């Protein structure tokens, strides 16, 4: 959070685009908030409740997805740099709270000593090879992250191209997605995992995601696309369930390393996904397209989730 705060300060002061890139680099180097939060939840919750805890992170993200653009718009109306100052202040307050107030999650005897071999991008990923089921579940998570990349990279282009939506309609779409995500991950995640188990909620989430992407891809009207938003929200069951299953396969001292590895997979997917989906979109709407299919990126994302379901079935046989 300190690095993120510094990033926003640089963007608020930026006289040119070079400063913006510098801020983004600092943010990327210090981007451990989600992995640290995941490790903390794994440390302080019993195994059977971890998926629900991870779901709360998703619910918080959904809340930010709703409130962030609204607050940023209000602040930016008076000064375009003010939203960055507000974001910097929020990040730094969060960092101070974590450092001075939040207690340590592990007793000293369960902590793992620091090693520089974990300080490289590959070191933490080695843990994923320590167990066959863990590696397969990590592959499921990676496919989910890769499929998710279609939304920030292509969704706005798609709805503008196919339905003629402007910024206002897109804003309502994003708000609806955030609200639905909050409901599923914040309210439904815990009772559903308690009733059906993490394995079943993982499959249900992947199935809903695959169906939702098909709805998006084949939607000929904007209202049909919107009808897919609640279905897609239940995809939010998959990520926390997969994380919960993975945390049960490593020791208490390895939870932070595991969350770092998961964050690494997310970063790799973020490198590959935008280019993959935007090029697919361009290919299927371009003049050389033999079959004009604007929704092709979403259908590709659906196939990735179906592949993830296959891997998850093989990895979790016998698990609840």
What do the PLM-derived regions correspond to, one by one?
Residues 13-18, 30, 164, 218-220:
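Helix-breaking motifs and short loop linkers at transmembrane-helix boundaries and internal kinks
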């Amino acid at each position: 959070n300190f690095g993120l705060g510094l990033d926003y300060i640089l963007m608020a002061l930026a006289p040119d685009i070079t400063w913006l890139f510098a801020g983004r680099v600092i943010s990327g180097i210090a981007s451990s908030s989600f992995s640290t939060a995941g490790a903390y939840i794994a440390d302080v919750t019993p195994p059977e409740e971890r998926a629900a805890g991870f779901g709360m992170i998703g619910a918080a993200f959904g809340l930010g997805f709703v409130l962030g653009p609204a607050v940023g718009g209000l602040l930016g109306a008076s000064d375009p740099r003010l939203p960055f100052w507000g974001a910097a202040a929020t990040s730094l307050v969060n960092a101070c709270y974590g450092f001075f107030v939040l207690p340590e999650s592990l007793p000293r005897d369960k902590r793992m000593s620091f090693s520089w071999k974990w300080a490289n991008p590959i070191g933490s990923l080695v843990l994923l090879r320590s167990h066959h089921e863990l590696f397969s579940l990590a592959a499921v998570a990676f496919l989910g992250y890769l499929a998710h990349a279609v939304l920030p990279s292509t969704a706005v282009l798609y709805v503008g191209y196919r339905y003629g939506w402007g910024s206002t309609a897109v804003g309502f779409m994003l708000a609806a997605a955030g609200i639905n995500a909050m409901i599923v991950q914040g309210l439904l995640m815990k009772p559903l995992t308690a009733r059906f188990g993490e394995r079943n909620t993982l499959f249900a989430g992947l199935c809903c995601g695959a169906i939702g992407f098909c709805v998006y891809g084949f939607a000929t009207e904007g209202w049909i696309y919107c009808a897919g938003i609640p279905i897609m929200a239940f995809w939010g069951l998959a990520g926390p369930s997969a994380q919960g299953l993975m945390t049960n396969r490593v020791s208490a001292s390895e939870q932070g390393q595991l969350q770092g590895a998961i964050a690494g997979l997310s970063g790799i997917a973020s490198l590959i996904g935008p280019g993959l989906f935007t090029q697919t979109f361009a290919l299927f709407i371009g003049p050389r397209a033999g079959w004009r299919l604007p929704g092709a990126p979403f259908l590709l994302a659906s196939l990735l989730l179906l592949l993830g379901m296959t891997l998850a079935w093989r990895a979790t046989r016998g698990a609840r």
